[in-house]
Amino acid sequence: MTRIKRGYIARRRRKKISLFASSFRGAHSRLTRTITQQRIRALVSAHRDRDRKKRDFRRLWITRINAVIRGVGVSYSYSRLIHNLYKKQLLLNRKILAQIAISNRNCLYMISNEIRKEGDRKESNEML
């Protein structure tokens, strides 16, 4: 059987993996077998948390909007605001509403008051 000269293929592969794990602590950045395990684990976490980040930010935006909106009226809440926005066909997503709530509360108060006034007028006309 003839000799096969592979050069430095294995070293190159291990070097690439160790560069990925160079910021890990202890054996996770030194031992090849644990590096590969930690690399798989890190990539799984990154993949999972990309989806989770979207959920977390949506929850944060909803919390911010709700906190500001509850200051408007006793019986007014986030769900009523979103319902009224949909009825009026206003295209403001939760991210924009949260930015308005943080930076300029008066603007959000004005939006919610206008929506509520028009909603109250329609309801009073329907009762008559």
From Swiss-Prot:
InterPro entries per the UniProt record, alphabetical: Ribosomal_bL20, RIBOSOMAL_L20_CS, Ribosomal_protein_bL20_C
GO cellular component: chloroplast; ribonucleoprotein complex; ribosome
Localization (cell): Plastid, Chloroplast
Pfam families: Ribosomal_L20
Molecular function terms, GO-annotated: rRNA binding; structural constituent of ribosome
Keywords: Chloroplast, Plastid, Ribonucleoprotein, Ribosomal protein, RNA-binding, rRNA-binding
Coiled coil: none
GO terms (BP aspect): ribosomal large subunit assembly; translation
Main location: plastid
Family that this chain belongs to: Belongs to the bacterial ribosomal protein bL20 family.
PANTHER family on file: 39S RIBOSOMAL PROTEIN L20
Function noted in UniProt: Binds directly to 23S ribosomal RNA and is necessary for the in vitro assembly process of the 50S ribosomal subunit. It is not involved in the protein synthesizing functions of that subunit.
Name recorded for this polypeptide: Large ribosomal subunit protein bL20c
Record organism: Gossypium barbadense
Lineage: Eukaryota, Viridiplantae, Streptophyta, Embryophyta, Tracheophyta
